[in-house]
C-alpha cells in the first residue's frame, strides 16, 4: 500500500483534519464537505485532499478521480495533487497516467522514498499488464549494476551506457516516463535498489528488488537483497522463507537445494508455512535427481532427515505431506494431501 502524505501543518484546515483521524470515512467525508462551504476553510488545500482520501477509503475511486479533475485548475501546482491522482489512477488501472503523476511528485520532492517506490510498483504493473512480469529483459551486467548490491552503475564505463541507449534499453534522458519493457525493468530495479540501500526500514523495496532480480534470473543477488532485512523487522521471517523459495525456484543445483534446506532448519518448525516449504524443497530435490537421470546426489550428506536418494526423498515427501494433512483445516484439503502422499511414497508390500 502506498502511504498518504503528511498533512501540511501550515494549512488552515490542518487542525480540523487531525480531528477527523479517528472518525469513520463516511463521517469524515461529510464533515469535510461541510467545512469546505465555510469561509474559514475556503483557502485550504488539505481539506479537498482529505475528501479524496475519504473517498478512496470508501472505495469511491471514480468519484475521487472526478473530484480531483474539479480541483485541477486550483491545485495542480501542488505535488500532493499529483500524488493522489497517481494513487487514484493506479486503483482504476490507468497505469500510464499514474506513472506520469508519480514522476511529477518525484521531480517536486526528489529526496523522498515514496514516489520512487510508487514509480517502481507502477512499472511492474505495466510490465505485468503487457505480459513481461517474468523473464529476463536486461543484460546481465546492467541488471546486476542496477541492483547495486555487489556492483554499481557508477562502476560501469560510459561506453556501456551509450551502447544500451543505442539499443533502446535506456532512454537518453533517463526518463521515468516509458512503456518500453527494458526501460521499465531497469527503472524499477534501480529505484527499488536506491530506496532499499538508503532506507532499510522500507522493507517493501527489498521484496520488490528481489522479485525483479528473480525475473532477471539473478538468484544469488535476490537472496542477498532479502538477507539484508534486519532481524528486528516483523518481515524478517517472511524474507527468510522467500529466500528458501528463491533458491529452489530457478535453475536447480544440489548446492542451492542444500542451502535452502539448511535455511529452513534454522526456522522453528511451529512456523505455519514450515511444512509447505519443506514439501517445496523436497520436491525440488526429487526434480533435480529425475532431470539428471540419477538415483542419488553427488554428496552422501542427508537432506533434512532423509538420504539424498530418490527413494528416501519420496518417503520424506510422503511423510511431510501426511504431516501437513493432519493440520489441514478442511477435510477436502486433508484428503487431497493424503492422496498426494500416496502417489509419491515409494512402493512397499505394506
Map each language-model feature to its residues.
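Short coil turns that delineate tetratricopeptide repeat
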Residues: 42, 76, 110, 200, ...
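Residue-level recognition of tetratricopeptide repeat
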Residues: 53, 87, 121-123, 128, ...
Amino acid at each position: 500500500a502506498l502511504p498518504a502524505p503528511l498533512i501540511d501543518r501550515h494549512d488552515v484546515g490542518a487542525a480540523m483534519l487531525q480531528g477527523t483521524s479517528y472518525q469513520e470515512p463516511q463521517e469524515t467525508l461529510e464533515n469535510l464537505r461541510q467545512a469546505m462551504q465555510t469561509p474559514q476553510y475556503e483557502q485550504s488545500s488539505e481539506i479537498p485532499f482529505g475528501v479524496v482520501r475519504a473517498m478512496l477509503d470508501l472505495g469511491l475511486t471514480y468519484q475521487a478521480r472526478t473530484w480531483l479533475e474539479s480541483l485541477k485548475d486550483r491545485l495542480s501546482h501542488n505535488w500532493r495533487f499529483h500524488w493522489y491522482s497517481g494513487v487514484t489512477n493506479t486503483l482504476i488501472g490507468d497505469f500510464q497516467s499514474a506513472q506520469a503523476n508519480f514522476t511529477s511528485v518525484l521531480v517536486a520532492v526528489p529526496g523522498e522514498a515514496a514516489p520512487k517506490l510508487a514509480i517502481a510498483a507502477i512499472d511492474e504493473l505495466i510490465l505485468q499488464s503487457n505480459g513481461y512480469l517474468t523473464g529476463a529483459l536486461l543484460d546481465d551486467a546492467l541488471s546486476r549494476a542496477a541492483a547495486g548490491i555487489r556492483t554499481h552503475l557508477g562502476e560501469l564505463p560510459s561506453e556501456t551506457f551509450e551502447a544500451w541507449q543505442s539499443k533502446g534499453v535506456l532512454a537518453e534522458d533517463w526518463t521515468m516516463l516509458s512503456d518500453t519493457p527494458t526501460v521499465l525493468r531497469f527503472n524499477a530495479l534501480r529505484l527499488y535498489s536506491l530506496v532499499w540501500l538508503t532506507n532499510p526500514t522500507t522493507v517493501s523495496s527489498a521484496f520488490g528488488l528481489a522479485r525483479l532480480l528473480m525475473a532477471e534470473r539473478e538468484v544469488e543477488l535476490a537472496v542477498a537483497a532479502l538477507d539484508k532485512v534486519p532481524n528486528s523487522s516483523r518481515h524478517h521471517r517472511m524474507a527468510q522463507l522467500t529466500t528458501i523459495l528463491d533458491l529452489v525456484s530457478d535453475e536447480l543445483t544440489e548446492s542451492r537445494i542444500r542451502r535452502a534446506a539448511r535455511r529452513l532448519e534454522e526456522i522453528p518448525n511451529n512456523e505455519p508455512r514450515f511444512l509447505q516449504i519443506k514439501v517445496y524443497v523436497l520436491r525440488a530435490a526429487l526434480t533435480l535427481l529425475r532431470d539428471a537421470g540419477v538415483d542419488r546426489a553427488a554428496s552422501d550428506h542427508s537432506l533434512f532427515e532423509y538420504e539424498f536418494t530418490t527413494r528416501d526423498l519420496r518417503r520424506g515427501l510422503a511423510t511431510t505431506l501426511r504431516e501437513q494433512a493432519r493440520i489441514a483445516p478442511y477435510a477436502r484439503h486433508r484428503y487431497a494431501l493424503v492422496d498426494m502422499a500416496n502417489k509419491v511414497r515409494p512402493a512397499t508390500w505394506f
